Amino acid sequence: MALPPILKDTLRLPIIASPLFIISNPDLVIAQCKAGIVGSFPALNARPEPVLDQWLQRINDELDRHNQENPDSPAAPYAVNQIVHGSNARLEYDMEMCVKYKAPIVITSLGAKEWVNEA
C-alpha cells in the first residue's frame, strides 16, 4: 500500500512521535512536525475543554506559516490521540474540534466507535 500524499510529501522519517500524557503540547508537536515527523498529543492534555480549540488553532497557524515560508521543506502532519473509551466524557467535543480544524490524523485508543472513524 502506497503512502498517502500527506505523508509521502512531508515525512523525512517514518515516525509518529508518541502522544505523551501530560507532556505533549503545542510547542512539542509543532517542533516535531517541522522536523519532518508526525507530531502528536492526547486531546485530554488540553485542559479544560476549550483549550483544545486554542491548541488546534495555534498548531494549524504555526504549521501553515512554516509551510508558506519553507515550500521546499513542508511540515509533516500532526495527530490528535482520542481516548474512545466510554469513560471519556469529552470525546464528542474533542472530535468536533478535530473536524473544525481538519486534524490531519486522528489516533484512537481504548475502544472503537464507528462515528469517530467517519468524522
Language-model segments: residues:
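Active-site entrance/lid segments in N-terminal catalytic domains of soluble metabolic enzymes
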Residues: 1-119
